[in-house]
Amino acid sequence: MGGRSSCEDPGCPRGEGRVPRMGCVKSRFLREGSKASKIEPNANQKGPVYVPDPTSPKKLGPNSINSLPPGVVEGSEDTIVVALYDYEAIHREDLSFQKGDQMVVLEESGEWWKARSLATKKEGYIPSNYVARVNSLETEEWFFKGISRKDAERHLLAPGNMLGSFMIRDSETTKGSYSLSVRDFDPQHGDTVKHYKIRTLDSGGFYISPRSTFSSLQELVVHYKKGKDGLCQKLSVPCVSPKPQKPWEKDAWEIPRESLQMEKKLGAGQFGEVWMATYNKHTKVAVKTMKPGSMSVEAFLAEANLMKTLQHDKLVKLHAVVSQEPIFIVTEFMAKGSLLDFLKSEEGSKQPLPKLIDFSAQISEGMAFIEQRNYIHRDLRAANILVSASLVCKIADFGLARIIEDNEYTAREGAKFPIKWTAPEAINFGSFTIKSDVWSFGILLMEIVTYGRIPYPGMSNPEVIRALEHGYRMPRPDNCPEELYSIMIRCWKNRPEERPTFEYIQSVLDDFYTATESQYQQQP
């Protein structure tokens, strides 16, 4: 819960996501039971018929004994939450609230919880990521739950923060412990972030340095706001935390076409178009329209149910589908479009190398998640990465590559087959695995470091295939560090099993500039 770090854009009404072509596949997925079943419409109810979201837990009735966790009594401190942000109701059953309002949780299920306002006694659904339990750390502006060290750095270095901006977060390595992250400046590296382990006393207190101990984290913050006492900076203000994206509407999975108002065509791909649209007059989304006949509706629905379960900060969120032809795929809206277009734009072409490495690290984090879940992307390239207004990169188009029914795309001779991104064993034998994704990631790194240049410039597809068979690999561009190029070369090993894992690639890219020094400051 809490987790105020999930959205990256202050101006984003409900997420951002512009989708090109899709592509993540569970290697061995048993399709039984994967089709959503339609719900009988209520005869008196005006409005769309919704099909349950395949990822949401079974609904509990408002009076269900299991609505709350075991041992939790309604109205006890455990069930009272406080609003971290204002929320204006947009669905019929929602409850509006102001930052600071307190509510009793009646039912916890999925991303929308049923609650009653203590002030107005009104009941309705609330977005669970907008509230925190009273007296919990999450009510503190400076506490960021479940955020990684790398994302803490991204947040603190973002515009709107200053010297001494800080956050306390859960430790990634030690369960139940915390870390303090502080924005600093040093002449050699410029703006930077320093991390301090917060250690725990046997008596339950906290300290960074044994000479200054505190009974609570709140006390620790007050102390280091007065003076730096050995830290790199005196703590100034909590890290800026924009409102998170509101969760997608409850149970709106297969939606009626009429609920989408198409507004602006963002692009056209091989299999359809991408539009900016508004869902039910209140939520900005991206809609990918698929040309009729490009895939079977049954195969698509089975794959979409699967893609919906892949939820990660660095993957574009799949919100809903229109399941009759022409198929519509509804995702979060991403303000800056594809990474390929962004890198070629005026803003993108000015991004310094450390930012390019950060883009690469974000993509490898998303791919490490896909790897961990035993999925495959099959079409990893800069055109299928989307960029948010605050330059967060998210992977799109996972899942669709496998179900496209177009020989131009599926056969290696086809005009649409992405030869230059595809591993030799996938070209020659149709063998797509996470290791062929690793090969594609090496090509994607080259796209990033050359600001969107087409791989193997000047070479035709047949020439590329022949060159690869003779051991040719793209040379290192002048602006590309040796360490980055060596990752590419490892991604392009002939034998798939010799290519690194995405988990390993992420660990190298996350610490690309700091691998030689300790991530955490020594005790002050």
From Swiss-Prot:
Expressed strongly in spleen and at very low levels in thymus. It comes from the Eukaryota. Its EC number is 2.7.10.2. The modification Phosphothreonine is found at T200. Gene3D superfamilies: Phosphorylase Kinase, domain 1 (3.30.200.20), SH2 domain (3.30.505.10), SH3 Domains (2.30.30.40), Transferase(Phosphotransferase) domain 1 (1.10.510.10). It catalyses: L-tyrosyl-[protein] + ATP = O-phospho-L-tyrosyl-[protein] + ADP + H(+). Transmembrane segments: none annotated. GO terms for biological process: cell differentiation; cell surface receptor protein tyrosine kinase signaling pathway; defense response to Gram-positive bacterium; exocytosis; inflammatory response; innate immune response; intracellular signal transduction; negative regulation of apoptotic process. It is an enzyme of class 2 (transferase). A lipid is attached at G2 (N-myristoyl glycine). ATP binds at L266, G267, A268, G269, Q270, F271, G272, E273, V274, K288. CDD domains: SH2_Src_HCK. The active site is at D379. Interacts with ADAM15. Interacts with FASLG. Interacts with ARRB1 and ARRB2. Interacts with FCGR1A; the interaction may be indirect. Interacts with IL6ST. Interacts (via SH3 domain) with ELMO1. Interacts (via SH3 domain) with TP73. Interacts with YAP1. Interacts with ABL1 and ITGB1, and thereby recruits ABL1 to activated ITGB1. Interacts (via SH2 domain) with FLT3 (tyrosine phosphorylated). Interacts with CBL. Interacts with VAV1, WAS and RAPGEF1. Interacts (via SH3 domain) with WDCP. This is Tyrosine-protein kinase HCK.
